[in-house]
Amino acid sequence: MASPLNNGRKASEIFQGQALLYKHLLGFIDSKCLKWMVELDIPDIIHSHSHGQPITFSELVSILQVPPTKTRQVQSLMRYLAHNGFFEIVRIHDNIEAYALTAASELLVKSSELSLAPMVEYFLEPNCQGAWNQLKRWVHEEDLTVFGVSLGTPFWDFINKDPAYNKSFNEAMACDSQMLNLAFRDCNWVFEGLESIVDVGGGTGITAKIICEAFPKLKCMVLERPNVVENLSGSNNLTFVGGDMFKCIPKADAVLLKLVLHNWNDNDCMKILENCKEAISGESKTGKVVVIDTVINENKDERQVTELKLLMDVHMACIINGKERKEEDWKKLFMEAGFQSYKISPFTGYLSLIEIYP
């Protein structure tokens, strides 16, 4: 008869394992809580309350018009979100509890320039969420991605055929690009000496516009899928071009790849990088490729950052057959694509800036 204590473990260890198991079993509630507060505009309500002052629970449920029969449940949701760092519980008038925004929930204020609310709406969209229910089936199917198994078509084909999903995706990528405005303030050196740059896969041009505003003399071109840029207009130093990065990338002093390469497997990345090398090979002496992407480093990163990067790797691998990479993976790609050297610099909390030289 097997021992009730697995492999001789202490009862305390087993109960710790149970707690970890249950935490992850209920982990899906985390993202649903985010969706709930974004759909109800709770960050916006707190942001606009008395010029951003904390809001009491009674004031919040009154604005939300929550029935008395559901106030306890709503309070549980708010308490859980506060515990996870999305709200701060403070004491105001006569020691009454109130909710204030944190750095995380400020990013979900829809009226904010740095709002990531569209990212929440995109990731928790039914097609994206539903695909994960097909993991078991995916293992034994020929299709490389759970997205393909779930919807019967590759991600990029689906996004081109579904206007609503395409719009949600582009809005999510655009709001993520706005965050770069903060990072680029400390990275002006990246663009010094350049006269032209191509933002490959640059979406609706948010990143390119940020660069153009910071460097008015720098000519910037956005290369994107034709259906994304067909109705977009440029400016004096910004142009939009519909094309295919797997076929040809316009000539420039530099090529920018922001969160592009993690979408693709190594063979596809090789094709993109080879085209980048061709694009920057000319008379310019400053030719380089600028990659903004994830570099996994489990030995140096904080646990929370590592967990995010590994989760992103799972997401990219299963949804579109993409990949988050360690430095040795990046080096192998760069060298095999014909580049001679590279330099990795910190960029944001989880992203790195990599300069690659031919």
Curated annotation (Swiss-Prot):
GO terms for molecular function: flavanone 4'-O-methyltransferase activity; O-methyltransferase activity; protein dimerization activity; S-adenosylmethionine-dependent methyltransferase activity. The keyword Flavoprotein does not apply. GO terms for biological process: biosynthetic process; methylation. S-adenosyl-L-methionine binds at G201, E224, M245, K258. It holds the Pfam family Dimerisation. Substrate binds at Y122, F123, L124, E125, P126, N127, C128. Its EC number is 2.1.1.231. Residues 155-173 are annotated as: Substrate binding. It is an enzyme of class 2 (transferase). InterPro entries: COMT-like (IPR016461), O_MeTrfase_dom (IPR001077), Plant_O-MeTrfase_dimerisation (IPR012967), SAM-dependent_MTases_sf (IPR029063), WH-like_DNA-bd_sf (IPR036388), WH_DNA-bd_sf (IPR036390). The active site is at H262 (proton acceptor). The keyword Methyltransferase applies. S-adenosyl-L-methionine-dependent methyltransferase that catalyzes the 4'-methylation of naringenin (4',5,7-trihydroxyflavanone) into ponciretin (4'-methoxy-5,7-dihydroxyflavanone). In vitro, also able to convert apigenin, daidzein, genistein and quercetin into the 4'-O-methylated compounds acacetin, formononetin, biochanine A and 4'-methylated quercetin, respectively. This is Flavonoid 4'-O-methyltransferase. It comes from Glycine max (Soybean).
